[in-house]
Every structure is written in C-alpha cells, then in structure tokens.
Design a protein with these regions (language model features):
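Conserved micro-motifs of the catalytic ATP-binding
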Residues: 50-55, 93-96
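A conserved beta-strand-to-alpha-helix junction within the catalytic ATP-binding
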Residues: 56-71
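Conserved catalytic submotifs in the C-terminal HATPase_c
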Residues: 83-92, 137
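A residue-level detector for a conserved hydrophobic packing site
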Residues: 101-102
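Short helix-loop "hinge" at the ATP-lid/N-box region of the Bergerat-fold HATPase_c
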Residues: 111-113
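Short beta-strand/loop element within the Bergerat-fold HATPase_c
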Residues: 120-130
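Glycine-rich/acidic phosphate-handling loop/turn and adjacent ATP-lid/helix
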Residues: 132-150
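Flexible, glycine-/charge-rich segments associated with ATP-binding catalytic modules
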Residues: 161-218
Length: 218
C-alpha cells in the first residue's frame, strides 16, 4: 500500500483534526480519557501508514517553516499564558517533506504545551555537521506523563523516513527534543521567482473569479 501524499493519511478525519486543535490549546483536555484514547488510536493508525508511505524528497526551508509554526502556536496559545519563542538567525535548507516535518513539529509542541512545567517553550533551528534540525526546549518531561509514547514514536518514524534522526536530552528540570535532517545543497525559489509565480496565478485566476463568482482578488 503506497501513499503518494501525506494528506491521504488524513482522508475522512477532518472531524478529528478539529478536535486536535482543541486538544492542542486546552490543557483540560488531558483529563478527557475518551478523547485521549482516540488520539492515541489515530496515532497508531498513522504509525502503520508511515511504514508504507513513499514521497519524493524536497528542499525544505527549515528555518522559515519552524518560525511560521512557532509564531502561529504562540498566537493561538496566548490566552493560556504559555509562550512559544523562536530563535534562529541564518536560513537552513534540508531534504525532506514539509508536511511530514510540520506534523512532527506540531506533535513536539503539543507535548511541550500540555506536559511542560513552565509557561515558556523555546524553539530554535540548529546546525550539526551535515545536518540541520529543530530543537524544542521546555520544562518538565515529554515522556513521564505519557501513557503510550506513540507521539514520540510518530516523530521518530518521520525523521527516519527522511534519513534524519530524533533524540531527547533530559535533565531534572528540562527536556530538549531534537529532530535532525540532512542538509540540502539546493535552494528554494528566490523571492523574485515566487513573486513571478504568484503574479502568474493571479493573472490566470482573476478573470475566472470575476466571471464565475463576481469577485476579484486584491
């Protein structure tokens, strides 16, 4: 069984995705055993799907992806008092799959949010030898409060799928989760190339939208 796109894994699970957003930003969710069990069940299904998943490696701007996700989480969690801070200076490009990496990072951030003992989660992009990676630092332990550890197994499998690595460094007060991916010598499209692509899309879609919906992009 081959899945060409990671989105195939989530076919028919839109309702669960909405619940997961509530799970991510509602600490009281940890007391809802029924929903927690469902979350673990879906993770087990995804772990099985990952064994058969195939995809074409792509060049991923890891620093931009990490920053965007961290900022979004910080905004969404602002009312809870938990802050997500991104630290990263230079761009780093890796070979992998942006959707898989996004899912893995969200899993780590949700662990840090739900089980962290401090109201601060620090996320940074790092460089180690021939790899670039993401480091998530929070107070407390990612594993001591977990009933199954499926989430971390999910992250580990994603890293292995992209020829990367995943490991955890723990002290008495903090947990550091690190995902590493092989560096890419390729560069993503430049800002000028992206602007040209967006302009082309706009020029082609705008007349269609006016004709079909009576609306126009601005």
């Amino acid at each position: 069984m081959n899945y060409k796109h990671f989105s195939d894994i989530y076919t028919g699970e839109k309702e669960f995705q909405r619940e997961k957003m509530q799970f991510f930003f509602d600490k009281s969710f940890r007391d809802k055993d029924e929903n927690l069990l469902r979350n673990q069940y879906v993770l087990l299904r995804q772990l099985g799907f990952l064994d058969d998943l195939t995809f074409e490696p792509e060049c991923v701007d890891l620093s931009s992806l990490t920053e965007n996700i961290t900022v979004a989480c910080d905004i969404l969690s602002s009312e809870s008092g938990v802050s997500f801070i991104y630290c990263g200076d230079s761009p780093c490009y890796v070979m992998g799959n942006s959707r898989l990496i996004t899912k893995a990072l969200l899993n780590l951030l949700s662990n840090a949010y739900l089980y962290g003992k401090e109201n601060l989660v620090t996320v940074k992009t790092i460089e180690k030898g021939t790899c670039c990676g993401i480091e998530v630092l929070s107070g407390g332990s990612f594993s001591e409060n977990h009933k199954t550890g499926n989430g971390l197994s999910f992250v580990r499998k994603i890293c292995n799928k992209t020829n990367g690595n995943f490991f955890i460094e723990q002290t008495l007060s903090h947990t550091k989760a690190i995902m590493l991916f092989p560096k890419s010598d390729l560069k993503q499209n430049s800002a000028r190339e992206i602007a040209d692509i967006l302009s082309l899309v706009y020029n082609r879609l705008s007349p269609v939208c006016v004709e079909m919906f009576g609306m126009q992009y601005h």
